[in-house]
Each structure stands twice: as structure tokens, then as C-alpha cells.
């Protein structure tokens, strides 16, 4: 208390101009002081040292997962880098890949289409892992990296998503993820369904989409674009949801379920 009393006494002795300066200094210190509660995401993120934008962009972050977008241009190699594991990649824009491990070429000009997914184990920097774009167009990726390394017993049962009016194609299934592909043709709706579990929607082909909850519109004809993401987790277990394609182009997205 004595310290605060001295500060107040000194403040009252200041001239009007000096008081304004004092207040400005306090505001700057408050606004730009480091946030002790901010989360350090570096252990979940990739760094491609050869690229102009080596860190890409964090496009989503919550208590379960971090999503990072990276773009590799034609003829570019990412540069030697590590992977944290518990991670999948989704090709928003696919292309031709070549890869090296321990400085040796592992594969060359392998094609990955738009919407294709894969799993990344942990790779230490000592393995000298590197990948390059062997095609003529940029490759755009979104990495989904889990924060929690839970045991099988802690995960419980997680079910595949089903839609009444649309068939979902299972693209990937392991101990941490399901990944399903959804295609909505013009005028097509998913059908009312429960939204259970922890899921992320990642758009591959965009368009105009509408959404309903319990039969009532949440929004109508919202434009979505490739690479858009949405966290899907219902606040009420009894609510039904559905989305519909109200545009003229086919919409495609992948549904990532965290187990």
C-alpha cells in the first residue's frame, strides 16, 4: 500500500503535460506487455526454412488441435524440417511431390489430388526430412495437429458421421482420426443429423451453402472457399443440424473427426 501511495503522491505533483505523458506511458506498457497466459504453439507447428513464408498461417486453434496452412510453390523444396507427430495433412490444392530422407531421394513426382489426406508420424530434425513440389502449380496444405497425446482408454468410443441424404466416403482411419469426404451437388442437403464428437470441416471445393438447426435456418447462401475451416461441436446433444448446397457448383469438404 505504501508503494501505491507514493506513486499517487508523485502523480499529483506532476504538471498537466507531464501527467499526460505519464498516462501514455502506462497505456503503452499495458497494451504491449507480454501476455503470460498466451499459449506457445511452436511445438505443434511446422517450419519450412526454404520458403518465403516458412511458418505459413495458423488458421484455427483450440484446446484440441492446431490447423496450419502452408503453400509450396512450383519447383520449391520445403527445406529440412521436423514433424511433431499426431498430425494429418489435407491437400486443398494437390500436385506432384518428391521427397528426401537422410539426404537420399525417397520418391519422385508422386501425385496427390485435391482433398487427399495422410498421416505424419513424428520425424526428428536429425532424419533430414524434406519434400518438394515437382509440378507446375502451387500445392496448398492444411495440417491438423493434435495437442493431446491421450491413451486408447481415455479416448472412448467415437463414431463415424452419417448423413441421411448423402453418402460419406471414408478416406482415413487410425487411432487418432477419422477423415470422411462429403460431396454436395447443387440443391442437395445432408439431411437432419446429430452433431456428436469433435469434428472439423475443411472445404476443398467451395460454393453457396446454407445451414439449419432443428429445421430453422442459421444462415442462407453463405459463400465458402477452398481452405475454409469450421469447428463442429454441438452445445446440445438433442439438436439436429444440416447443411445444403444452394449454389450452382458442387461443394466438397472433408470432415475430420478427433477420436
Placement of each model-derived feature along the sequence:
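Ligand-binding loop in jelly-roll beta-barrel domains
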Residues: 94, 124-147, 234-259
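Bacterial N-terminal signal peptides that target proteins for export
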Residues: 5-22
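Bacterial N-terminal signal peptides
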Residues: 22-31
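Short acidic-glycine-tyrosine-enriched beta hairpin
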Residues: 105-122, 217-234
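A short glycine-rich, His/Asp/Glu-containing loop-to-beta-strand
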Residues: 53-80, 85-92, 162-192, 197-201
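Glycine- and acidic-residue-biased ligand/ion/polar-headgroup-sensing regions
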Residues: 84-103, 196-215
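Surface-exposed beta-loop interaction hotspot
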Residues: 132-136, 140-180
Amino acid at each position: 500500500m505504501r508503494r501505491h501511495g507514493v506513486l499517487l503522491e508523485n502523480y499529483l505533483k506532476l504538471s498537466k503535460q507531464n501527467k499526460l505523458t505519464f498516462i501514455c506511458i502506462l497505456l503503452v506498457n499495458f497494451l504491449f506487455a507480454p501476455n503470460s497466459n498466451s499459449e506457445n504453439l511452436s511445438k505443434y507447428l511446422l517450419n519450412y526454412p526454404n520458403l518465403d513464408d516458412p511458418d505459413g498461417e495458423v488458421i484455427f486453434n483450440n484446446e484440441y488441435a492446431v490447423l496450419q496452412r502452408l503453400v509450396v510453390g512450383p519447383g520449391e523444396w520445403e527445406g529440412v524440417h521436423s514433424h511433431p507427430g499426431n498430425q494429418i495433412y489435407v491437400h486443398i490444392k494437390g500436385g506432384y511431390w518428391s521427397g528426401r530422407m537422410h539426404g537420399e531421394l525417397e520418391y519422385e513426382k508422386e501425385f496427390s489430388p485435391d482433398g487427399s489426406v495422410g498421416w505424419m508420424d513424428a520425424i526428428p530434425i536429425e532424419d533430414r526430412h524434406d519434400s518438394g513440389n515437382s509440378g507446375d502449380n502451387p500445392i496448398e496444405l492444411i495440417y491438423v495437429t493434435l495437442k493431446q497425446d491421450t491413451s486408447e482408454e481415455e479416448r472412448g468410443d467415437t463414431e463415424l458421421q452419417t448423413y441421411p441424404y448423402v453418402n460419406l466416403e471414408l478416406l482415413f482411419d487410425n487411432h487418432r482420426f477419422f477423415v470422411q469426404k462429403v460431396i454436395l451437388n447443387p440443391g442437395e442437403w445432408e439431411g437432419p443429423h446429430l452433431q456428436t464428437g469433435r469434428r472439423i470441416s475443411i472445404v476443398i471445393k467451395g460454393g453457396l451453402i446454407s445451414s439449419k438447426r432443428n429445421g430453422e435456418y442459421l444462415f442462407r447462401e453463405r459463400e465458402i472457399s477452398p481452405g475454409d475451416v469450421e469447428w463442429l461441436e454441438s452445445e446440445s446433444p438433442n439438436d439436429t443440424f444440416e447443411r445444403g448446397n444452394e449454389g450452382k457448383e458442387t461443394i466438397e469438404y472433408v470432415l475430420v473427426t478427433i477420436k
